[in-house]
């Protein structure tokens, strides 16, 4: 190990993004957390998600995952997009490669939040997937209306808040891979898909790192 690496380890000890434990080896997660990640058995969600043409989610938002996602979104750790995109490719890379997408589009973030956070985690994921899949990453989708923070709203409030809150450049029949970090009710993804199709997309399939556990047979929002 180089002197600089030793110095960095002393100043900034490596901690698991999930449990916070110190790690002796290089990496993002400790072996215990890495070995117990809540991967979904089926990555393709069976819920009715129109106007989405499909939704793929790699993991379930439970156990240790919420802490890792929180670190990624709110604690300035944009570099974790590399790690989470690798988890997505590990679980559903074959399906995404077979998708033959024309563009990869991230769920956009409103300007005030972007300025405060410094990055859009969905965009960071989309850029990493763009490299993996060799598909262009487009910024054609924009947030045009300010909305409340989603986790503060009920399912019905989320649907109402998202309505007409996005805009998109003119498209010409492209097949789109829509990317976000988490699917909760699906209202954001569905509104983005509606906007993309209204702009001319022929097909919109979404992919997220994780999805909140759903104990009902169909989504209510």
Give, region by region, the residue ranges found by the protein language model.
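Glycine-rich phosphate/pyrophosphate-handling loop used in enzymes and phosphotransfer proteins
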Residues: 1-180, 184-221
């Amino acid at each position: 190990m180089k002197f600089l690496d030793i110095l960095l380890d002393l100043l900034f000890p490596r901690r698991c993004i999930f449990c916070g434990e110190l790690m002796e080896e290089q990496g993002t997660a400790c072996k215990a957390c890495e070995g117990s990640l809540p991967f979904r058995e089926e990555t393709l969600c069976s819920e009715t998600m129109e106007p989405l043409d499909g939704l793929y989610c790699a993991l379930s938002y439970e156990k240790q995952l919420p802490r890792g996602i929180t670190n990624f979104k709110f604690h300035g750790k944009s570099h974790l997009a590399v790690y989470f995109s690798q988890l997505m490719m590990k679980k559903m890379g074959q399906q995404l490669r077979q998708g033959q997408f024309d563009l990869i589009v991230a769920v956009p973030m409103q300007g005030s939040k972007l300025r405060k956070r410094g990055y859009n985690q969905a965009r960071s994921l989309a850029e990493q997937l763009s490299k993996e899949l060799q598909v262009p990453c487009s910024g054609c989708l924009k947030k045009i209306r300010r909305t409340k923070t989603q986790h503060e709203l009920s399912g019905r409030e989320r649907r109402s808040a998202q309505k007409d809150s996005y805009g998109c450049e003119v498209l010409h029949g492209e097949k789109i891979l829509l990317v976000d970090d988490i699917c909760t009710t699906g209202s954001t993804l569905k509104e983005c898909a509606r906007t993309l199709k209204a702009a001319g997309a022929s097909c919109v399939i979404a992919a997220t790192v994780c999805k909140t556990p759903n104990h009902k047979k169909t989504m209510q929002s």
